Amino acid sequence: MRAFCTVSAPLEVCASSAEQLSPGSRFLALRLLGQQQPKTLYFLVDAKSRVREVYTQTCLHFATQGMLDTELFGLAVLIDGEYMFADPESKLSKYGPKSWRSSHTHGLDANGRPLLELHFRVQFYIESPFMLKDETSRHNYYLQLRHNILQRDLPREQAEQALVFLAGLALQADLGDAPPGTSNSKDDSGEETSASPSNGGRGLSATTTLPKISKRANERMLRLSTYVASTSKRETIPLPPSLPPNGADYYRIEDYLPSGLHTPWARSAMRACHREHLGMATAEAELLYIQQACSLHETINAHTYRMRLAKSEQGSGSAWFVVYAKGIKILGGESTNSSSNPETTTFLWPNITKLSFERKKFEIRSGESRITLYAASDEKNKLLLTLCKDTHQWSMKLAARLKEVSKREEEEAAESQRLHASYACSRSLLLPYKSKNEQRISVISSTSSNTTSGIVSDRVHSEDELEIMINTPPAPLAAPSTESLALAHLLDRPSVSRQTSSVGQMSLKDLEEQLAALSVRPQDASSNGATIVTNSSVQRNSMGTTANDSSTATDSPSSQHNIGSQCSSTCSTVVVTSPVNGAGASSSGAPIPVHSTSSSLELGFSHTAQNSALSETSPDDFLSTSAREETESVSGASGVYTLAHGAPPTETSGVYTMHSSELTGQSSEIAESEKSSHYGMFQPQKLEETHVQHSDSVDGKKKEDFRPRSDSNVSTGSSFRGDGSDPTDNKHSLLSAEELTNLIVGRGTYPSRKTVSSSLHSDCDYVTLPLGDQGEEEVDQPPAPPPPYSARHEKTGLCGPPIAKPIPKPIAVVAPKPDSPPCSPPVPPAPIPAPPPAIRRRDPPPYSISSKPRPTSLISVSSSAHPAPSAAGSMSSLKSEEVTARFITTRPQISILKAHTSLIPDGAKPSYAAPHHCSSVASSNGSVCSHQLSQQSLHNSNYAGGSQASLHHHHVPSHHRHSGSAAIGIVPYGLHKSTASLHHQQSCVLLPVIKPRQFLAPPPPSLPRQPPPPPPPNHPHLASHLYEREMARKQLELYQQQLYSDVDYVIYPIQDPAVSQQEYLDAKQGSLLAAMAQAAPPPPHHPYLAMQVSPAIYRSTPYLPLTLSTHSRYASTQNLSDTYVQLPGPGYSPLYSPSMASLCSSYEPPPPPPLHPAALAAAAAAGAGSSSSSMFARSRSDDNILNSLDLLPKGKRLPPPPPPPYVNRRLKKPPMPAPSEKPPPIPSKPIPSRMSPIPPRKPPTLNPHHANSPLTKTSSGAQWAGERPRPDLGLGLGLNRGNNSILAQLQASMVAQSHAQAQAQALDIALLREKSKHLDLPLISALCNDRSLLKQTKVVINPKTGQEMPTSSAQPSGATTNGVANSSAGAGTLSKARKGSTVSHRHPQDKLPPLPVQQLAEANNYVIDPAVMMKQQQQQQQHNKTS
């Protein structure tokens, strides 16, 4: 990084005197956007200045003018007529001519102009003009689109009327209101005379009456629609007599229209359009211009570059490489004229797997397909790859802003829909954001997988298209029935009238009154319109996609065309038929109806830049693959855009791979709804076979292809599907073509408020539950007897069935009030049908009770501050190759736990609003975000919580993956193929707090554990001990049914508030004890069989050091039935049955836990016979009850253990004695006076379970390392370093004072060396406690100096072992007990003495402070004096 900026602030002129400039200074020109006389800024730069410095100064300049979106723009260089964006880190001299680098005139040419010019251009195109924050940014964006329209080659029959309309808007934005003197008398009277040539070249005059100008916007647009449509195909129009000469125009036509449209007709039409926008503000005109220009053609709101299709091709190339906000388009081969439209290939960002270039070759890979293009130079390929990478990253960054814009537009659109038709139209024309109500039809190709774009095309089906359809054959187009919709989906562009008809048809929106007004259009335009409709639609069908591929304003949330209907409907259509021949269609004059094989009209218009595309090739992707975080920079003549940290790109190659991402969590939080997104696509979901078969061609190839519709905030009730079926009708009876037409064009009845229903099977926002008794639901045949407990954890969702006998005392749950009351009074409730569906989403087909698998849901616990509740995982398909659908909902922050929306800490009281689900969710920070549980939170409880009507269902586990640290998959209760017959083998699973991507395979359990018993025989007995009354029990069941439904709000049943929460807890615990007393022990269950039954079991903690690094805070509170014991060591399974492990009398008790430091001394004083019951300590009230197993030292951290086997150390060690070597002789009887009174650090008396608990004798390190626990052989040195601190050990040693036992166990130094290899214990600890070992080391201690001296200078090599080093290191401590019968032991916080240097002390790290050594020597001398 440069120390200072070498670029000056912008200068107005570059005429500074030469003597004031340094020799290395150069002038640089920056051309700004503009048409007439673009402004130029000048910078004084250094020869070694970089592009980034100039960009920084430019941003500062525009920031002073109020620009907030400076990052939208970049600095480009003009290379071969194309604007290529310069690399910010490159030097300016790289893009300047050689004369600029070596210039002696400070980079100026002979005319005083800088030789190096940069251009200020839009680098990142956006989807909605409402994303622009300020007027300066909007003005520059408007100027860029004006430049693009003049430079792009657009199909003339599509563009000429649209360009005239845009020119009128540009005149209004640039010049304001039209001057009054420009119109002649005939214009004022409302007539214009024009002639058009007929087939023989003869000119025939035709007069079109133009209505008088009215201030009402809808009349203005109708007048323009009629006028421009009547003159749409007149190529040569003679000059009217009253038309002033060309020089009299108040504008330059070349600044507003391409050269091909410089005709008198275009001039007069421009003036008429300009007058129509009288009174419109400049900002509104620019905003409308941006909106309409984005919908015109795919090349306007994008970058276009010429590329070669073949290596041998000459020139700049015949293909267009288009980079826009959502991906890449390739317009291949032909010139873009009306006769031969180029073939279009679209690659959306989620579908692109890799972008790379190798010198002049540029390659795009999408799934199994690839496209190879060739550039004119290596540098162009490098800059193109950099642009694609930056655009992809920018689109992800901008997704949050697009989400906000979409919400704002939806709200304002809903408001404008309630206005009068004419008033709404005028508001939509004059207000910037009242523009969101058009039927958007997205053609989504799910059969193309990743090979092509996820969205093949988008088009707008609105009444401006119907304007032409009404008077134009074929007749089926006049009414969008289900058959005509299939054809309409194949039209890739907003075709029909928005391109062919004029001004008014482009901005006039679908209102019922205007249909009647447009029906009187002159018939001479009908034939022309028909031909245009067919031609343009078929051409764009062959292209495969459109400009509005959800990037344009027509179908994006910011669409000006969205005014007239109640909701934006996305129609997902799978197009598998071959495209229609364009020539044949044009000649026939009528489009050929081609039916799609699968489609579904889905409601909702939440469009974001980063919506997830479901890919069939990655079935385990839970979240979107579109959000990514690229870290590579491409340099040189080739590169690969990739996320993997591969080899750095060189000057000749580069790659950008777009597979995985670290921002997938962010993408899921940003994207509101996949179904209505630009990239979204869904896998078809299986239906139950009990549904009526559907044979219509619009809704799909099979009856299973119904999909959940979008979570729209507007169309909440009485909505419809694309096939015309009523969502509240389980049989999916289709609507008629007339009814569907009424709904599409806005004549249908949509409630503009939240709806309330009395049925749990509707798609309303509120459900009102009855207070009276209802008929009992049918249940399956009763299974085996109930388990000995009846409890459900409020966080994990683990629920057990009720006990056989109810507690006499009725317990009721106090129902919290709903946060939001329903908007309308409740409707009288309808009786619940006997077999209710298992799960209800917004609008899925109901699942009947059969042997089909029930869906397994995923709960996404989002880590953001305000995430949308995830509606993850609706209905899993039966076929293995099908992908579980992923849903990202637009629903507001209202979940099934609306009554309890706060985060629940570990010690919080139970939440009675939590669903009775056998699932567990823990967020990454350890707290359970229970208010973020999905509404489809797992209906997999085989224990049948309150109101589940079906018990025997198989479970299909869905693939899931972490999104950052956000999502944790829910493991269902049973995952066996025959769950209905194996209820006794079910196992409860408690998911812990796990960091992302730490799912480890659980170790096999070595102890048999009792499975949870089977479900109860009947549903009504579930809450019989809690709710005595039938009404209360029924309310609870109805409430639980709401939790599985698709509603936004849940009205909690009113229970008897006489019983408090504490009494409820007491009753629950009492039911546990009562169930234990009366339940017979279940049959023994083999642990490995349990692992086979439930394979998807996750460890509570990762394997190695994580349990030793932090306290284990499980996602549970101190409920005995919902926690489990986690013991160290491989001998025990980390997963116990939560109830059996701690409650069942037949269960074998777990090994005793290590003692707390406070209880250690008392246990030592009690003797070796102390029972294990005295070792349990009470846990804290807010902690897990099993945290009394204090696995971590509370005091100071222990010093590191010695290296494991010394022979494996990298450091050189003295040779160890062979195993056959005879150890030195051991004294037959130790001398009492020379014995240290300190017993071993952990004598056998401190381990009450010495015989049956070998794990506690093995060090934690040995256990985690996977070594086999070895018997202690009477050494009593098995310190568990993970359980007690040094302070606790020394305190226990001082209390014990067991001299006789220490004397009775004389240790062998060779055996101690052998044992010290596998013990987590320094040898110095044993030497400090047993003086008899010191003799065997042949070390003599000088009592005066406290230093050791070897007995002989010629020691054998076997004697110089680690024991010698450790014993000599501890000599400073041992020398204190030379003469005294008692010794002052080392302070617990003191470090161990250092090892001598000649013994390679770097292999261990025990040190001691010199001050401590001096203090010990003084104490030694005092002991000598006193003795």
From Swiss-Prot:
Keywords: Cell membrane, Developmental protein, Membrane, Phosphoprotein, SH3-binding, Transcription, Transcription regulation. One of its GO terms (cellular component) is Kibra-Ex-Mer complex. Residues 951-963, 1376-1388 have a biased composition (Basic residues). InterPro entries: Band_41_domain, FERM/acyl-CoA-bd_prot_sf, FERM_2, FERM_central, FERM_domain, FERM_PH-like_C, FRMD6-FERM_C, FRMD6-like. The modification Phosphoserine is found at S1181. GO terms for biological process: border follicle cell migration; compound eye morphogenesis; compound eye photoreceptor cell differentiation; endocytic recycling; energy homeostasis; follicle cell of egg chamber development; negative regulation of cell population proliferation; negative regulation of imaginal disc growth. Phosphorylated by Ack at several tyrosines including Tyr-227, Tyr-423, Tyr-679, Tyr-766 and Tyr-1103. PROSITE patterns: FERM_3. Residues 545-559, 860-877 have a biased composition (Low complexity). Changing Y766A: Inhibits wing growth. Reduces phosphorylation by Ack. Residues 176-212, 520-566, 611-656, 688-732, 766-792, 815-880, 939-963, 1000-1022, 1190-1267, 1345-1398 are annotated as: Disordered. Residues 688-710 have a biased composition (Basic and acidic residues). A motif (SH3-binding) lies at residues 1008-1020, 1149-1157. Residues 818-838, 1001-1019, 1214-1230, 1237-1246 have a biased composition (Pro residues). Residues 26-399 form the FERM domain. The modification Phosphotyrosine is found at Y227, Y423, Y679, Y766, Y1103. A motif (RXPPXY motif) lies at residues 842-847. Pfam families: FERM_C (PF09380), FERM_M (PF00373). Residues 192-211, 524-544, 848-859, 1253-1262, 1345-1370 have a biased composition (Polar residues). Transmembrane segments: none annotated. Activates the Hippo/SWH (Sav/Wts/Hpo) signaling pathway, a signaling pathway that plays a pivotal role in organ size control and tumor suppression by restricting proliferation and promoting apoptosis. The core of this pathway is composed of a kinase cascade wherein Hippo (Hpo), in complex with its regulatory protein Salvador (Sav), phosphorylates and activates Warts (Wts) in complex with its regulatory protein Mats, which in turn phosphorylates and inactivates the Yorkie (Yki) oncoprotein. Ex acts synergistically along with Mer and Kibra to regulate the Hippo signaling pathway. Forms a complex with Kibra and Mer. Interacts (via RXPPXY motif) with Kibra (via domain WW 1). Interacts with Mer and Hpo (via SARAH domain). Interacts with Schip1; the interaction results in recruitment of Schip1 to the apical cell membrane. Interacts with ack and yki. PANTHER family: FERM DOMAIN (PROTEIN4.1-EZRIN-RADIXIN-MOESIN) FAMILY, PROTEIN EXPANDED. This is Protein expanded. The lineage of its organism: Eukaryota, Metazoa, Ecdysozoa, Arthropoda, Hexapoda. The gene is ex.
